Design a protein with these regions (language model features):
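Stable alpha-helical elements in mature extracytoplasmic
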Residues: 1, 5, 17-20, 74, ...
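Well-ordered alpha-helical scaffold segments within catalytic/enzyme domains
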Residues: 1-14, 60-71, 97-106, 151-160
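A broad, structural surface signal
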Residues: 3-7, 22, 26, 83, ...
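Extended glycan-interaction surfaces of carbohydrate-active proteins
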Residues: 13-92, 113-129
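Generic detection of long, well-ordered alpha-helical segments
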Residues: 14-18, 108, 142
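Short, contiguous acidic/charged loop-to-helix segments that flank catalytic cores in large enzymes
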Residues: 52, 84-89, 102, 135-143
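Aromatic- and histidine-enriched alpha-helix N-cap/loop-to-helix transition segments
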Residues: 55-60, 89-96, 106, 140-147
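Non-catalytic C-terminal accessory modules of carbohydrate-active enzymes
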Residues: 109-205
């Protein structure tokens, strides 16, 4: 990703010539939107959208990048793209990806829906290893075993280089109150303790 490359170069080689990469960035095609308002998977008019396809990789701009932050149109387009591909619910890794994107988009309903599917199906083994499918009918897949913490972190604390937001995408059920300790943010700060209680209307950090 060009944005990530330039950001890294600014940190590790601030005096380096970036003209080549900036020129390449200007050659990248703009985002395109389909007739539902969703972000298109391919930045070309040569292909129709295939919303039966299992991946949401074109929402890279939402997660792990942060291009949707402060961009209402792109945020709405990504939310619509998630909605259009709701049929992909049989793979645990797809639900993990959907959850991470929903949390970044602060879409509590979509996040809750994905988490309910993850938690209420037979994905986990007694060993706490997880399966590729949600009926344990396939092979081992570590995405959920590793990714669940990332989902919770994204839902409870958003951070970037100069910003921290608490409870940006709290799921609609199961998270009415809780405590989180020792979370490292992207700007090198540490949330030593986050405690919330929705019934009491309190958040402390």
């Amino acid at each position: 990703n060009m944005e990530m490359l330039l950001s890294v170069m600014n940190d590790v080689a601030p005096g380096a010539d970036q003209s080549r990469w900036k020129q390449l960035e200007t050659n990248l095609p703009p985002y395109l939107y389909d007739d539902t308002g969703a972000l298109k998977e391919w930045a070309t008019t040569a292909f129709d959208e295939n919303n039966e396809h299992r991946h949401l990789s074109h929402l890279y701009c939402a997660w792990p990048l942060m291009e949707t932050r402060g961009n209402a149109r792109l945020t709405a387009a990504c939310k619509q793209a998630v909605e259009n591909r709701k049929s992909e619910n049989e793979a645990s890794h797809a639900l993990v990806h959907r959850s991470l994107i929903a949390a970044r988009l602060q879409d509590r309903a979509a996040l809750t829906d994905a988490l309910v599917n993850l938690m209420n199906h037979k994905i986990r083994y007694n060993s706490l290893m997880t399966n590729h499918d949600y009926d344990r009918g396939s092979c081992y897949c570590t995405d959920f075993a590793i990714g669940y913490l990332g989902i919770v972190h994204e839902a409870l604390v958003y951070s970037n280089d100069d910003e921290i937001e608490l409870l940006p995408a709290l799921p609609e059920s199961g998270f009415d109150r809780g405590t989180l300790t020792g979370l490292k943010t992207r700007n090198r700060a540490t949330v030593t303790r986050l405690q919330w209680d929705l019934a009491a209307g309190t958040v402390q950090a």
